[in-house]
Amino acid sequence: MAFVPPQAGYDRAITVFSPDGRLFQVNYAREAVKRGATAVGVKWKEGVVLAVEKRITSKLIEPSSYEKIFQIDDHIAAAPSGIIADARVLVDRARLEAQVYRLTYGEPVPLTVLVKKICDLKQAHTQYGGVRPFGAALLMAGVNDKPELYETDPSGAYFEWRAVAIGSGRNTAMAIFEDHYSDDLDMEGAIKLAILALAKTLEEPSPESIEVAYITMKDKRWKKMDKEEVAKYLGEILEEIKEEEVEEKEEDYSELDSNY
């Protein structure tokens, strides 16, 4: 008889807790997010910006067909990490809920309402048989009375942030936010910070590998930046990074000289 590891039953069953109180399938769904493309969001007083890594694996892929920031409604967008097919199902559901709310109440859906509905769906997929957890996290951002930015977890939990990252580069990006985020950021500063955090997670950052969109309280409509705009910001950021590296090397050499 083949040996069956003690945790095997908990691995297979979505609705059964392990003795130490974990749902293994939810943990595995989170692992899918940790291996996914990095997505970041930054909020400032008058708006929100999202920036996402585009992993184009072949030069034959049409870049325009590889969408990574999804518009839910005029005033709400989402950026996923993890299994994109799972994220697409969540995005389609969010779009449907936004349309139903608008038709029912005659006004745009509040982001908090939409986030809760999507997370209720995610949570249900951790509780019932015949389904599995969604292997995707979403950053959901938008404006109603104020700018808002949420992270949704595969478990169905959600959190509001000033600046946040998901995906494989989360730790690096969050460290950048901890060092550089300020409540006094303007639009220019927020966009630069988002692109900086994302660029730091990439081996070879380029305008083709970064997608950026933002919304302001004034317009209340999402706008995607074109490749030329991204290239402008990225060029400035990479130049600043080079200058910082040169200054650090100069400081290192100064310390060496002082030891002689």
Swiss-Prot record:
GO annotation (BP), single: ubiquitin-dependent protein catabolic process
Keyword vocabulary terms for this entry: Cytoplasm, Proteasome
Keyword rRNA-binding in annotation: no
Keyword Plastid recorded: no
A molecular-function term among this protein's GO annotations: threonine-type endopeptidase activity
Entry-linked PROSITE patterns: PROTEASOME_ALPHA_1, PROTEASOME_ALPHA_2
SUPFAM superfamilies given in the database record: N-terminal nucleophile aminohydrolases (Ntn hydrolases)
Subcellular location: Cytoplasm
Main location: cytoplasm
Entry GO CC: cytoplasm; proteasome core complex, alpha-subunit complex
Regulation (activators, inhibitors): The formation of the proteasomal ATPase PAN-20S proteasome complex, via the docking of the C-termini of PAN into the intersubunit pockets in the alpha-rings, triggers opening of the gate for substrate entry. Interconversion between the open-gate and close-gate conformations leads to a dynamic regulation of the 20S proteasome proteolysis activity.
Lineage: superkingdom: Archaea
Subunit structure: The 20S proteasome core is composed of 14 alpha and 14 beta subunits that assemble into four stacked heptameric rings, resulting in a barrel-shaped structure. The two inner rings, each composed of seven catalytic beta subunits, are sandwiched by two outer rings, each composed of seven alpha subunits. The catalytic chamber with the active sites is on the inside of the barrel. Has a gated structure, the ends of the cylinder being occluded by the N-termini of the alpha-subunits. Is capped at one or both ends by the proteasome regulatory ATPase, PAN.
Function noted in UniProt: Component of the proteasome core, a large protease complex with broad specificity involved in protein degradation.
Family the entry assigns: Belongs to the peptidase T1A family.
HAMAP family assigned: Proteasome_A_A
Name the UniProt record assigns to this protein: Proteasome subunit alpha
Record gene name: psmA
